Amino acid sequence: MKVRTSVKKLCRNCKIVRRYNVVRVICKSEPKHKQRQG
């Protein structure tokens, strides 16, 4: 998982999710695209 100041969708399967006040990107097709804002 990458930790970034700004998270972006990297492909069309990426989804932006907000959990416990933390913005995350989850991606089923490409697990490398997982990101967390921090």
UniProtKB/Swiss-Prot annotation:
Asked whether the UniProt record includes Ribosomal protein among its keywords, one would answer yes
What GO terms describe the biological role, i.e. biological process, of this protein? translation
Disulphide-bonded residues: none
InterPro entries, from UniProt? Ribosomal_bL36, Ribosomal_bL36_sp
One GO term describing the cellular component: cytoplasm
State the similarity comment.
Belongs to the bacterial ribosomal protein bL36 family.
PROSITE patterns with a match to the protein in the record? RIBOSOMAL_L36 (PS00828)
Q: What is this organism's lineage?
A: Bacteria, Pseudomonadati, Pseudomonadota, Gammaproteobacteria, Enterobacterales
Q: Which domain of life is it from?
A: Bacteria
Q: What is this protein called?
A: Large ribosomal subunit protein bL36
Molecular-function annotations in GO: structural constituent of ribosome
From which source organism is this entry? Answer: Buchnera aphidicola subsp. Baizongia pistaciae (strain Bp)
What are the entry keywords?
Ribonucleoprotein, Ribosomal protein
What Pfam families does UniProt report for this protein, alphabetically? Ribosomal_L36
